[in-house]
């Protein structure tokens, strides 16, 4: 252990800490699953938005990374990441100006996404102006009902239109499954349905002579189910998977079966500011730190409410505490026992580590997060997505 490292006690609260042992274990597990399934791993980085964590993922076996918004691609590219897929279709002059900046970077492979011809036509004009063909995937909606064209014939028709555009190099299709019943059987079913629709569409494309061998599926809740299908060689057309949240984990994905509780790497480090009320303590972190996601979609699950309130996270090592009342800059952590023993009572100045409900929200509100190991700070990660990336148009 490096004795010169900052001790955990020196971190000003509230702050987000990441357990490096757990983070590294999660990265290794994702890579192992993809490798055994015989597909490339391209993790989505929205949960951490940290180039240095992305580099750990690439060093661990990922072929590149995925971002949601094109602005995040710029942050990652400027930090030296050289293979980036932009998972969300985009449109408008502001976004195209960022695309041009990305395409100006030597050695950078950028792949874009479309689900409407209008998006693709704008990107086509950029490609023509630069004298190059921009790699593009077609987003296919297999049930998430956000972005995407319908699988099968609608996707084939759109793919043919994309192939006819100059300045575009059509690569294949992209599927992101979401929803499903949060049970092992529900995740198995969701993975099977998404993979089936993706592969049926890919086979139709091949039959129609449409080039595009890239078939990408996946999500954190279905990671293991998808890899089990692929390991069984049922869907050889699938070439890539793109889970993201299970890199870090949170209580959302514990409920969604993407992570075990012990695989949650991130926590909010906070300090008890008041213990005046015997029923609870007040901490120095509120929804400006945690975000305001109560995970109400899981309200029918056992243990979701306590005394009529959902929680905003889970206290590490203290199942007898309920973080259930939250305001802007403070929150109340309640004792679940009516009269806890003195040894169980928190005192002013005590510190808690609380796994947030939605780590994506929590981390997105930080400028930095602390990588910790054995009671000390091993490294500090910059959350690059926080930076202003408005280009000159």
Annotate each language-model stretch with its function.
Residues 1-18:
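Generic N-terminal amphipathic, Lys/Arg-enriched alpha-helix
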Residues 2-3, 22-53, 66:
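N-terminal glycine-rich anion-binding loops that anchor highly charged ligand groups
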Residues 23, 46, 76, 138, ...:
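Conserved, mostly hydrophobic/aromatic
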Residues 44-182:
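Active-site-proximal beta-alpha core segment in soluble small-molecule metabolic enzymes
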Residues 135, 142-258:
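Active-site loop/helix belt of alpha/beta enzymes
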Residues 223-308:
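Active-site loop ensemble at the mouth of alpha/beta enzyme cores that anchors a bound cofactor
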Residues 279, 283-393:
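C-terminal accessory subdomain/extension
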